[in-house]
């Protein structure tokens, strides 16, 4: 197959591993900085230009699009879909997953377990907002935050009020969630490919840190999932329309709860922790689902 990896940095671990896995299986692979592409969107024969050359006849696309590049990145993915390329994640699913509020609303509608969550912008009834999720302690998040940035644990009602007031001064949209104390600062990253969890790890926050992000000094270990946890991760990815996803779960007293779904999950932490060839699993999935030579429009509006 002819595969395009859409990535701004070919030296990133995830990009390198995907390229290596594809080449090991004898595919023709090209890493493309999607931010440097331009497109003809009105042509009867739509195309993408990169480094002065038309990008044509790709059987499969692997988007590795960071949060800050979502708008243009998904536009490029959409153009490849119009040209008939099979994307590991569709442009629509990526856009949907990048909106944290919309993601939670979709998951709630599908009956998937979530922490009790409130959403606000400039409410004057801060006390009511806090009580809506069961009172302190609560976790307060900036809607646009990533990698644990803009996430605060408020252990008392007064602390929660102070944080919400401060965020309100930033003219920010905020999520307020119940704090799952029994999780003890750990979460579980489930890596879903297709309709299967191919690898999973438990992440523990650094000393005195309730956020478990590896970017923030957390550590990771292999973990055995329960059937309910596997089912929840797969159902969550499917609800979002994601074929490749990192689903973050908390273990609560009333079952697994979904914290977040990532449409461009990193491979380094999960591969080094579990020893699973996750990049290879993604390429295998493309082999089974991307029909070489298919040129019909795959776009979903």
UniProtKB/Swiss-Prot annotation:
Binding site for ATP: 141, 178-179, 187, 211-213
GO biological-process terms attached to the record: protein modification process; SOS response; translation
Binding of Mn(2+) 1, residues: 248, 260
ATP-grasp domain segment(s): 104-287
GO cellular component: cytoplasm
Keywords, ordered alphabetically: ATP-binding, Ligase, Magnesium, Manganese, Metal-binding, Nucleotide-binding, Protein biosynthesis
Cofactor note: Binds 2 magnesium or manganese ions per subunit.
Any one Pfam family match given in the protein's UniProt record, by short name: RimK
EC class: ligase
Amino-acid positions noted as binding Mn(2+) 2 in the UniProt annotation, renumbered to this chain: 260, 262
Residues annotated to bind Mg(2+) 2: 260, 262
Alphabetized PROSITE patterns for the sequence: ATP_GRASP
Cofactor: Mg(2+); Mn(2+)
GO MF: ATP binding; metal ion binding; ribosomal S6-glutamic acid ligase activity
EC number: 6.3.2.-
UniProt: Mg(2+) 1 binding residues: 248, 260
Family recorded in the similarity comment: Belongs to the RimK family.
HAMAP family, alphabetized: RimK
Listed NCBIfam families: PRK10446.1 (NF007764), rimK_fam (TIGR00768)
Stated name of the protein: Probable alpha-L-glutamate ligase
Origin species: Picosynechococcus sp. (strain ATCC 27264 / PCC 7002 / PR-6) (Agmenellum quadruplicatum)
């Amino acid at each position: 197959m002819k595969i395009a990896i859409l990535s701004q940095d070919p030296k990133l671990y995830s990009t390198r591993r995907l390229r290596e896995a594809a080449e090991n299986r004898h595919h023709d692979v090209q890493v493309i900085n999607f931010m440097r592409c331009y497109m003809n969107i009105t042509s009867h024969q739509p195309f993408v230009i990169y480094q002065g050359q038309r990008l044509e006849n790709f059987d499969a696309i692997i988007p590795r699009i960071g949060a800050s590049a979502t708008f243009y990145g998904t536009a490029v993915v959409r153009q490849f879909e119009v040209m008939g390329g099979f994307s590991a994640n569709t442009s629509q699913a990526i856009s949907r997953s990048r909106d944290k509020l919309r993601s939670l609303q979709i998951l709630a509608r599908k009956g998937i377990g979530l922490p009790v969550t409130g959403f606000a912008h400039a409410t004057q009834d801060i006390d009511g907002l806090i009580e809506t999720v069961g009172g302190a302690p609560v976790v307060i998040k900036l809607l646009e935050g990533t990698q644990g940035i803009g996430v605060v644990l408020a252990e008392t009602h007064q602390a929660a009020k102070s944080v919400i007031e401060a965020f309100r001064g930033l003219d920010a949209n905020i999520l307020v969630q119940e704090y799952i104390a029994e999780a003890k600062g750990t979460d579980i990253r489930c890596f879903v490919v297709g309709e299967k969890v191919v690898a999973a790890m438990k992440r523990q926050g650094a000393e005195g840190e309730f956020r478990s992000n590896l970017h923030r000094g957390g550590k990771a270990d292999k973990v055995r999932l329960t059937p309910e946890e596997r089912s929840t991760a797969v159902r969550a990815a499917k609800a979002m329309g994601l074929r490749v996803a990192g689903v973050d779960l908390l273990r609560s007293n009333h079952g697994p709860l979904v914290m977040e779904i990532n449409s461009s999950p990193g491979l380094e932490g999960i591969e080094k922790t579990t020893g699973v060839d996750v990049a290879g699993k993604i390429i295998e999935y493309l082999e089974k689902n991307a029909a070489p030579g298919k040129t019909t429009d795959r776009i979903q509006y």
